[in-house]
Regions:
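C-terminus-biased signal that marks the final domain/tail of proteins
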Residues: 1-15, 51, 130-131, 138-139, ...
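Short acidic-glycine loop/turn motifs at beta-strand connectors
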Residues: 8-11, 71-73, 146-150, 155-160, ...
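Structured loops at beta-to-helix junctions and adjacent beta-edge loops in soluble globular domains
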Residues: 19, 73, 80, 146-148, ...
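Aromatic- and glycine-enriched pocket-lining scaffold segments that form the walls
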Residues: 115, 119-155
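Alpha/propeptide regions of enzymes that mature by internal proteolysis
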Residues: 8, 94-128, 221-235
C-alpha cells in the first residue's frame, strides 16, 4: 500500500512524500548521491547528477534503486505500485528516450529541476521492460512527480505513455489515474467544513458534533479509498 501526497504552506514551502508499506523488509534505506556523480543508464549511457539527491531505496551493485527521491531543487519522484495488469513496459525504441522502470526516480532527479521540464521530456519517453538483473525482476509502477508548483502522474500502459496533470496532488495504486479522477465525482458532496446548525422548514437543527460533513468518506485501506481520503484531506 503506497500513498504519495504533495502540499505547500502559505509561504509556498513544499512538503511531499509517500508511505512505503511492505509485508517484509527488502533492505531499503536512505540513499544519498552527490552532485556531479555519474551513473550508467541502461539505454541513455552516462548521466551526471545536476545536484545532490536523497531518497529511500536499495543499493544494488553500487546503483541506487530509488523508491522515491528528491533533488536539491525540490523536484520529487516516487514510484508506486501499478500492478494487476495496468503497467505495460516496452522494448527499447531508438526513436525515444528509453528509461527503465528502476531508473525513473534517479533519471528524473538527475536530469531535471522542475515538473514542467519532466513533462516536456516525457512527451518522447519510453519506459522499458528491462529488469535490473535476473534476481530482481521488473516492478509494475506508475510515477508521481512533484515540485513546489504542481504534480504530474506518468503511466506506461498498453495504450501508450500517459502523462496527467494531478490537480489532487495525490497518487495511490491501481487502477489507473483517470479512474481515480472519475471516481472522485462520487464524493463531490463531501466537505471538510463544519456546519454547526441548519434550519429545515420550521425545524432548527444543531450538529451532534464535528464530522458529519464527511459522512460517507471511505475508511478502508484499498488504493481507491485511500486516494479519496487523502485527496479530501489535502483539498
Amino acid at each position: 500500500m503506497c500513498t504519495a501526497v504533495r502540499l505547500t504552506d502559505k509561504n509556498n514551502n513544499l512538503y511531499v512524500g509517500r508511505n512505503l508499506d511492505w509485508g517484509v523488509p527488502f533492505g531499503e534505506k536512505p540513499l544519498l548521491v552527490p552532485a556531479d556523480w555519474t551513473w550508467q543508464s541502461r539505454h541513455i549511457g552516462a548521466i551526471a547528477t545536476q545536484s545532490p539527491i536523497i531518497g529511500m531505496g536499495l543499493l544494488m551493485k553500487d546503483m541506487p534503486l530509488y523508491f522515491d527521491a528528491v533533488n536539491e531543487a525540490g523536484l520529487y519522484c516516487a514510484g508506486l505500485s501499478f500492478a494487476a495488469g495496468f503497467a505495460h513496459y516496452n522494448d527499447a525504441d531508438p526513436s525515444k528516450i528509453n528509461v527503465t522502470s528502476f531508473e525513473m526516480p534517479l533519471w528524473v532527479c538527475s536530469e531535471f529541476t522542475t515538473v514542467a521540464q519532466v513533462k516536456e521530456a516525457a512527451q518522447n519517453l519510453n519506459i522499458t521492460n528491462d529488469a535490473f538483473d535476473p534476481s530482481l525482476p521488473t516492478s509494475d509502477l506508475h510515477w508521481f512527480v512533484a515540485d513546489k508548483d504542481q504534480s504530474i502522474v506518468i503511466e506506461q500502459t498498453a495504450e501508450g505513455l500517459k502523462i496527467y496533470d494531478d490537480g489532487f496532488d495525490v497518487l495511490t495504486n491501481q487502477p489507473d489515474f483517470q479512474f481515480h479522477c472519475n471516481n472522485m465525482r462520487n464524493y463531490i458532496h463531501l466537505d471538510g467544513d463544519w456546519t454547526p446548525e441548519r434550519t429545515m422548514r420550521n425545524a432548527h437543527l444543531t450538529a451532534l458534533g464535528v464530522g458529519p460533513s464527511v459522512m460517507g468518506l471511505p475508511g478502508d485501506p484499498s488504493a481507491i479509498s485511500r486516494f479519496v481520503r487523502v485527496a479530501l484531506l489535502n483539498a
